[in-house]
């Protein structure tokens, strides 16, 4: 009986630590998401994932390119040694058309939550797999640098399930040396 209670208590504790990715899209047309994008807003389940320009998950997506194999090449900029560095990452397709895996700071899952293809896309990057640790970063991408308040509201609603989220809204008119702008 003591072992059963201990197992139940541990499973409840671990369940509270997990961070679930909000619902993903049913279908995703890779050809439609291809092209230039701008990181407009970032949200994290833990502030330490975004609290400086050089943290590994604070990246600025610039372009998405579908590959002939059905994968997705992601061109991004990130802070490194007080400079912006461009990187290309290939996200591998999975059975779910809106979910990819990527080897970036460990193997991670990228889930596309929503897109209208012409104006916005929301996605989340989960913690390294397999992992019980929490730590998810989500982004609102837009085809232009202009923040659409309606879409920002929709982004916020899509992320309601994330515990302790922190939102950072980028200033597109801000400094030129900031990565992505």
UniProtKB/Swiss-Prot annotation:
Subcellular location: Secreted
Principal subcellular localization: secreted
Stretches of the chain forming a coiled coil according to its record: none
Disulphide bond pairs: 84-179, 124-138
A GO CC term assigned to this protein in UniProt: extracellular region
Keywords assigned: Disulfide bond, Milk protein, Retinol-binding, Secreted, Signal, Transport
Pfam families reported in the protein's UniProt record: Lipocalin
Signal peptide: 1-18
PROSITE patterns: LIPOCALIN
Stored InterPro entries: Blactoglobulin (IPR002447), Calycin (IPR012674), Lipocalin (IPR002345), Lipocalin_CS (IPR022272), Lipocln_cytosolic_FA-bd_dom (IPR000566)
Gene Ontology molecular function: retinol binding
Subunit description: Monomer.
Function in brief: Lactoglobulin is the primary component of whey, it binds retinol and is probably involved in the transport of that molecule.
Family membership noted in the UniProt record: Belongs to the calycin superfamily. Lipocalin family.
Protein name from the UniProt record: Beta-lactoglobulin-2
Organism lineage: Eukaryota, Metazoa, Chordata, Craniata, Vertebrata
Recorded name of the encoding gene: LGB2
